Amino acid sequence: EMTSSLVGSEMCIRDRSYTCQWDMTNAGNWTVLTNGDKLWTMEISSPNALSINLLYDKFWLPEGTSLFLYSKDKKQYMGGFTSINNKGDSINLKGFATGIIQGSNVILEYYQPAHISQTAIISICNVVHGYKPIVAPAILTRSFGGSGNCQVNINCPEGEDWQKEKRAIALIVVNGFRYATGALLNTTANDKRPIFLTADHCLGGWGNYNIKYDAVTNPNLNHYMFYWNYESPSCSRGGSEPQILSTSGATILANNE
């Protein structure tokens, strides 16, 4: 089940992940505004990167606060993230992921009104440095537009009757790699619960992904990103990757190998 909330629009380009341990106590700068509100900012630079996205091992925002990410030229931003995006609470902390910011710098900006006493917990554990168009592990070597001749794009004439259904399809991105796909399912209650169906092999356990997730022992997919509307704009292959919307995080309800 997807635990995600809308996090913004961006393009799919990145590939190499670097481990770090930055949080609001050992990185960034705090500023107290004249009205008592607080602002925490942090700039991350990854020289020569085409894009950057961040993974968090701990993420929690108090109600009433907000977090934005934006590029250094301020042409692209993401957020605001709020308490709605929390996967856990301030005690039972869980991870998080944010999508791609184009360029070699990303700026985080956290805003906390003066009347809020609790401070957010934002701990960054990985910086994904994009150095080439999105490429998956060895088993998934094709990039955007590299599908075979047998592939029929959704915007070909054959897809005319599936234009509503295509909105349920998402590309799964894990640690900067284009990883798998899946689709949203409805329930008999028609309650819009975000149930997402994908293949069991998309839960890891092979190649570079030796961590295997399952519904019983390891169900939290907090670092999984879901990219919507990832499609060719026409029937032909190739072209530029689309502007897309992304959501993050899910919990495995059931799986079967």
Residue ranges and their predicted role:
Residues 43-44, 75-105, 111-116:
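Beta-sandwich interaction modules
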Residues 61-76:
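Short, surface-exposed beta-strand/strand-loop-strand elements in extracellular ectodomains
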Residues 2-8, 12-13:
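Single conserved hydrophobic/aromatic residue that forms the stacking wall/gate
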Residues 26-36, 174-175:
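Extracellular beta-rich ligand/substrate-recognition surface
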Residues 49, 74, 175-177:
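Glycine-centered tight beta-turn/hairpin loop motif at sheet-sheet or coil-to-beta transitions
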Residues 34-45:
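Short beta-strands within extracellular/lumenal beta-sheet-rich domains
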Residues 46-53:
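Extended extracellular/luminal ectodomain segments enriched in beta-structured repeat modules
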Residues 100-257:
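Serine endopeptidase catalytic core focused on the charge-relay Asp
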